[in-house]
Amino acid sequence: MTDFPPLVIDYHGSRLAGVDEVGRGPLVGAVVAAAVILDPARPIEGLADSKTLSEKRRLALADAIREQAAACAVAEASAEEIDALNIFHATHLAMRRAIDALPVTAEYLLVDGNRMPGHHVPGQCVVKGDRRHAAIGAASILAKVTRDAQMVALHERHPEYGFARHKGYPTREHLAALERLGPLEEHRRSFAPVKQWQLL
């Protein structure tokens, strides 16, 4: 059962790409976007909003998406680009990059959220789209698995910040590490909690 009205899509072809992002809220690292065109002949069971799935389930589904989707791509906008553009515009840049990186050209986009990313391919926004359409759910999963792996890699280089645990979000642990150690090169300088602890 869902609280959402039925999703009406103005496209009935086979090149519909779901688009989603992960990483707008963290204080460190890139914002990551993914675009996925599912193959109706190879359905993937269990696609949902990545935040509702266990890490083990997300990893298994990410493998299935890469193997069974008609096309998929992941892209990002760096912390430097976030600082230069702001997080809103950087998120849309990452989305456009993911759409452009698809090995099969999308004909229609379903984008999670309430703003289109400014791509020339037509489409529509879907609020809570990762819960309402499988292609957006698949994009959410790929983006989160990719970004989480980046945070684990950053944790291995800087374990004192705890990135593997909080994934860069402004948790008490992360804020305490910032206060104690200061920001890393990978931190987003334009975000207030980071700006506060930068050395002048």
UniProtKB/Swiss-Prot annotation:
Record-linked PROSITE patterns: RNASE_H_2
Binding positions (a divalent metal cation): D20, E21, D112
Domain RNase H type-2: 14-200
GO biological process: DNA replication, removal of RNA primer; mismatch repair
Protein name (record): Ribonuclease HII
Gene that this polypeptide is encoded by: rnhB
Disulfide pairings: none
Source organism per UniProt: Chromohalobacter salexigens (strain ATCC BAA-138 / DSM 3043 / CIP 106854 / NCIMB 13768 / 1H11)
Entry-linked Gene3D superfamilies: Ribonuclease H-like superfamily/Ribonuclease H
